[in-house]
Amino acid sequence: MKINRSIRVAAIVVTATIALGLAACSQFEPRDKRFYYRALWNFALREDLAELDSEFNGVDFGHSNLYENLLLTGGTDVPAIEDRARKETLAFIASKPTLNPNEEAIAPTYMKLAWRAQNTFDEAHALHRATYDIMVSNEPEKERAIRDVLAFYQESAYAITAKRLDHRQLDQFPYSKTFRTRFPLFNATIWSYHYLQVAVYDPLQAARDLAAKTRAMRPILATYRCYLAQPPVEWTFMPLTAELSPVFAARYPEIANIFDNLHMLHDNISDILASEQVPTWDAKRTEIYRIVNAYYLASADGKNPMVVNDQEHHH
């Protein structure tokens, strides 16, 4: 009789497992990450400008650590974000990581909530990394290499639009500015990351050799580290590529637009995760995917109301 009871219990467990699995299927998202663009210049930044590379590795940790903590604390616990999570991020940056971290290990909850949004970030971050590698490397045809990686990026279903978006309008949702208002220190820290990511382009392009590139990075890194120590809470909007690297933005306007749009999407998602106006995890996921699909992905270009005409510039 014990055998029959065990069989019944096992059947119940199997049935429950299948039911749970079927319920979860509606939320299942395949991990369809692409391999990075392969070239001889891969990892040139890591090999030749390791100091700058380690700072970017810290940036990767900061975004994921923030999103995970916003989710797990409900987005309202100021000490948990401004003190604990921010200090965790600063400690990781100070450790000078030699490799970029596994962001899914840092933010497993967020990755389950909004995998497609995270993969949108990952693809654009890979474009960042590729452009740095090309500029630091001894690649003789840098212009063509950059055009090639842009074309590779734009083949992705997760590619952010290369058109200029109206960032001011994208900052007018009902939940907009929640994050920077409630967490000004961490917000300014995030904007400091974005300063570093775009401020390096013009100096890297202008420097003729590795020694000159190394020298050119010193004042930018010094400024960035000052921002980490004393976050620029007086800033009212995120840094823009054309403001900090105007030569790069003029030469590669599509890439500059992608990076600015990427950074605006970071701000939107921070606001969604922090806002009580988007109260549940399901609601947050729905809103994140709504704005990604409607306003940020290149696949929406034909009907995206946030695209700015060439004659306009809304910043």
Regions found by a protein language model. Give the residues of each.
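C-terminal motif of bacterial Sec signal peptides marking the signal peptidase cleavage site
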Residues: 22-24
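Polar/charged low-complexity regulatory segments
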Residues: 26-315
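Bacterial N-terminal signal peptides that target proteins for export
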Residues: 2-12
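Core hydrophobic alpha-helical transmembrane segments of single-pass membrane proteins
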Residues: 13-20
